[in-house]
Design a protein with these regions (language model features):
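Basic nucleic-acid-binding interfaces
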Residues: 1-86
């Protein structure tokens, strides 16, 4: 699972062979989440509320880049790093 961003102890990644709606994964020591890219719907999450808010704020800022990376992943291409939340 290629890592595309890291911030505040959170790792953002995408699988090359993932299926279903375009989405990304967020991992933290205290949990993880799976989030749709098109509407930022939380599909599944065990992240604490604070970390989830950070992830959603970051995703809103980088939604276009996430979509581009999803297309790259589907094509088996190398994913681009995305700026962390500052």
């Amino acid at each position: 699972m290629p890592t595309i961003s890291r911030f505040l102890g959170i790792v953002i990644a995408m699988f090359h062979d993932d299926h279903g709606y375009p989405h990304f994964h967020a991992r933290h020591a205290e949990g993880e989440a799976k989030i749709r890219i098109d509407n930022l719907e939380v599909i599944d999450s065990t992240l604490p509320r604070r970390q989830l808010r950070f992830v959603l704020a970051w995703a809103e800022l980088h939604q276009d880049e996430l979509s581009e990376n999803w297309q790259r992943a589907r094509a088996g291409e190398t994913l681009k790093d995305i700026e962390p939340l500052r």
